Amino acid sequence: MSKTFQPSIVMLTIFLILVTSQRRKCDEKIVLQFCNGRNRCYEYCDTKECVAACKKKRNGEGICNGDVFSVSAQCLCLYKC
């Protein structure tokens, strides 16, 4: 394996552990938010019930600032609906 590939596996493993360990009722569900570098974010909710709540932040309002957890302050953040 290349040296750049291995750390990404570690990060993915850590992320999966964090998401699965923090599953709660819907109003506290974790939202995964990827920023594209221009303060626009792509959000992924883990339940259908949370999708509507998350769409409210999708239109450029969301900026990754590490409110709940961040691997990088500008790239990958976890938010709550």
UniProtKB/Swiss-Prot annotation:
InterPro entries in the cross-refs: DEFL (IPR010851)
First-listed, main subcellular location of the protein, grouped into a coarse class: secreted
Disulfide bridge partners, by residue number: 35-81, 45-64, 50-75, 54-77
Location of the protein in the cell: Secreted
Record keywords: Antimicrobial, Disulfide bond, Fungicide, Plant defense, Secreted, Signal
Superkingdom of this protein's organism: Eukaryota
GO BP term, example: killing of cells of another organism
Gene Ontology cellular component list: extracellular region
Extent of the signal sequence: 1-21
Family to which the UniProt record says this protein belongs: Belongs to the DEFL family.
Name of protein: Putative defensin-like protein 135
